[in-house]
Structures are given as C-alpha cells and as structure tokens.
Amino acid sequence: MKLILGGYANGRTAYAMQNYQLTESDCFDAAAEPLARWNGQRLILHAEQLVNPWLEQGKEPCTEILPWLERWQNAVLITQEVGCGLVPVTPQQRQLREAVGHFNKLLAECAETVERVCCGLGMQLK
C-alpha cells in the first residue's frame, strides 16, 4: 500500500494519478460512497472520511480499518493531513481530528511508501 497525504487542495489526487498511472475508473471516493461499495479500485480518495462514521457508531477506526488494509496491499490511499490548522471549536470536532490523526499514523505505519504532497509537489517520507 502507498499513502499520499497533504493539506486541502494541494494536488494529492492529480499527483497520485500522474505518478501511479491511474485513471478516473481506478478511483474510489470514500467521501461519496460507503466502504462496502469498494470494488477493487486502486486509488482510494479521502480515506480520512472513513473515520467519522465509525466514531458515530461507537467503533474504533484504527481497529475497523485493519481488515481493509490487507485488501488494499496494491492500492494508493489519499488522506488529508490534520492538526496543522485551527483547533476545532467543539469537543466532537476535536475528537474527530484526534482520531483522524491516529488513523493517518496507522496508515503510515502500514504503508510501503508515504508521500506528502504540498503545492502539487511530492516529498517521500517513507
């Protein structure tokens, strides 16, 4: 699995598609589709969006994602970096940001490579 992370609107998707020769048909958008609809697409967009539904169900996102990581061994995951902006106002928003941070850390630990994209430029972290 390869992980690409970065801030909002920094070109993560375009970077992934160009550098890993992926097309629109290779994309699964976790912000728009339930995870159960994943059908082998190699590029998983908005992986951080998987966290909130699990939290709302009282589940632990870092546990829930484990079976999926085995299925995604050949996938490229894109996730948004959190924690570099304003502190969220509500306790629920702070809990979500913290959970996404732990989730991204787990993804990075499990990934073969980790790249950070800023201004459309990739930097290899792992």
Show the residue positions of the predicted features.
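A short secondary-structure junction signal
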Residues: 15-18, 55-56, 126
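Glycine-rich P-loop/Walker A and Walker A-like loops and their local beta1-loop-alpha1 context
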Residues: 1-30
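Short, solvent-exposed loop/turn segments at secondary-structure junctions
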Residues: 10, 49-50, 83, 122
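Conserved nucleotide-sensing/catalytic segment adjacent to the nucleotide-binding pocket
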Residues: 25-77
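Fold-independent oxyanion-binding glycine-rich loops
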Residues: 7, 47, 119
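Short linear motifs at secondary-structure transitions and domain/linker junctions
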Residues: 21, 52-54, 89-93
